[in-house]
């Protein structure tokens, strides 16, 4: 962990899921209630360092690198779908062997933890999803309105193009950090530096590139199971915190009606924050999360 995040940093561990060696970090405090932090797409587990540092005195905190992300193995083929991600989380929890669990996820990670919570509601204490309800309803309608042959053609063409898509390289860490800050203008300098250091790998030619598989960008051609996902949301028995950045592209789950599928939810909208709420307004986010969890943050 960088000096900005404090502490000595987490320890690295691995587990296996579907023959892939996957990575996770452990922030210590074993014996306390388990808290798992799940990152979003094209991100990495160390983006949770600041959050984990605040919560490790209350929880045994761990955070996985999703398949194809960070220091986890890349899938062979195109196996980057929600079923695989949820299975990986279930496998991690079986590997750790602690229950029940509190889950926090961002974006794709938020969708993953909500799926898991709906499949295994008895295993959960509380769930927090930061913009983790999936694509906005209008986008889903647009995509699902296309015939299957068009969706299949688009997917095939995307998959065929990915081998020729060269990952972006940066001559220095400073260049990579500049790109990080341009994509996330709300980031503090310390946060941008931290996310960059842990988000890149140095190549043989001396350049840097982001630590994720380009194939994670592709989504499958089959329709998003709106009714199935809503059923899973409705099966969650534990309290749910839904967080959204007021300046994000993500749809408001209260006004668009999706929040009504949860039995027991709290909604928090954070001003001057985009999609990465926990980075953009860290202290405000921690206030909401700490209040929801019932701990000092």
What do the PLM-derived regions correspond to, one by one?
Residues 17-18, 25, 56, 62-108, ...:
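Active-site loop/oxyanion-hole signature of alpha/beta-hydrolase fold enzymes
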Residues 230, 234-273:
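Conserved loop-alpha-helix segment in the C-terminal half of the alpha/beta-hydrolase fold
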Residues 125-169:
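Flexible "cap/lid" loop of the alpha/beta hydrolase fold
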Residues 25-74, 258:
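Conserved HGGG/HGGXW glycine-rich cap/lid loop of the alpha/beta-hydrolase fold
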Residues 1-36, 56-59, 97-100, 134, ...:
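Alpha/beta-hydrolase fold catalytic core
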Residues 164-223:
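Conserved alpha/beta-hydrolase catalytic His-Asp/Glu region
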Residues 110-121, 127:
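Short glycine-enriched nucleophile-adjacent loop
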Residues 273-286:
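Catalytic histidine-centered segment of alpha/beta-hydrolase-like enzymes
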């Amino acid at each position: 962990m960088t000096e900005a995040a404090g502490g000595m940093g987490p320890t690295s561990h691995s587990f296996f899921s579907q023959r892939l060696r996957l990575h996770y970090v452990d922030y210590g405090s074993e014996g306390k209630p388990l808290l798992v932090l799940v990152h979003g797409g094209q991100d990495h587990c160390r983006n949770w360092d600041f959050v984990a540092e605040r919560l490790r005195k209350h929880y045994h905190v761990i955070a996985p690198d999703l398949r194809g992300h960070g220091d986890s193995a890349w899938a062979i083929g195109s196996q980057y779908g929600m079923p695989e991600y949820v299975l990986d989380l279930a496998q991690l929890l079986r590997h750790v062997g602690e229950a029940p669990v509190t889950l926090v996820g961002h974006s794709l990670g938020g969708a993953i933890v909500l799926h898991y919570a709906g499949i295994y509601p008895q295993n959960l204490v509380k769930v927090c999803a930061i913009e983790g309800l999936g694509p906005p309803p209008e986008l889903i309608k647009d995509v699902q309105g296309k015939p299957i042959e068009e969706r299949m053609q688009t997917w095939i063409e995307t998959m065929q193009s990915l081998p020729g898509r060269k990952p972006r390289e940066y001559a220095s860490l400073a260049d990579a950090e500049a790109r990080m800050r341009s994509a996330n203008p709300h980031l503090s300098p310390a946060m941008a530096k931290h996310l960059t250091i842990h988000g890149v790998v140095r190549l043989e030619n001396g350049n840097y590139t982001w630590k994720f598989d380009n194939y994670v960008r592709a989504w499958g051609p089959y329709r998003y199971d709106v009714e199935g996902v809503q059923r899973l949301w409705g099966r969650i028995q534990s309290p749910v915190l839904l967080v959204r950045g007021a300046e994000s592209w993500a749809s408001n789950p209260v006004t668009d009606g999706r929040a009504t599928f949860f039995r027991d939810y709290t909604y928090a909208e954070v001003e001057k924050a985009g999609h990465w709420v926990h980075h953009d307004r860290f202290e405000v986010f921690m206030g909401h999360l700490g209040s929801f969890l019932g701990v000092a943050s």
